[in-house]
Design a protein with these regions (language model features):
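Terminal alpha-helical segments
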Residues: 1-130
Length: 130
């Protein structure tokens, strides 16, 4: 991997790691922000997948839908994400940031989102072996 590509992949992974860290902080705060934790978990997953796509030299549109990003992966990598509720996590990119007709995130939602983000982040890092 070229040093330029390595640096770009590392930048995306570092941002994903920061999003996950702050999602945990929002979840564990004395006044928890569950919607924010869900949004940041989605962001962690998105950035982890985009780092993987950059590493694989797969071009992608700057979209937030995680299922779109997973579909761009080679089939062997897609299988790693099959059991995850990727579409559910994708929804938090909007539901977690804006008021609207969405139900407020619950503690269970936030825990599920963080767990999914951790799995996606870990899988991406295991594949990348940076």
């Amino acid at each position: 991997m070229s040093s330029k590509k390595h640096l770009e992949v590392q930048r995306w992974i570092n941002k994903a790691k920061s999003d996950l860290r702050v999602a945990r902080m929002a979840f564990n705060d004395s006044v928890p922000e569950y919607s924010l934790a869900c949004y940041l978990s989605q962001q962690c997953a998105e950035k982890s997948l985009k780092a993987l796509l950059i590493w694989l030299d797969v071009r992608f549109l700057y979209k937030h839908q995680l299922d779109y990003l997973v579909e761009l992966l080679p089939p062997d990598y897609q299988r790693l994400f099959e059991e995850m509720d990727i579409e559910w996590l994708s929804d938090w990119v909007t539901e977690g940031r804006y008021p609207g007709d969405y139900p407020e995130a619950t503690r269970d939602d936030a825990q599920k989102a963080i767990n999914m983000a951790e799995k996606i982040f870990t899988l991406a890092n295991e594949i990348l072996v940076l």
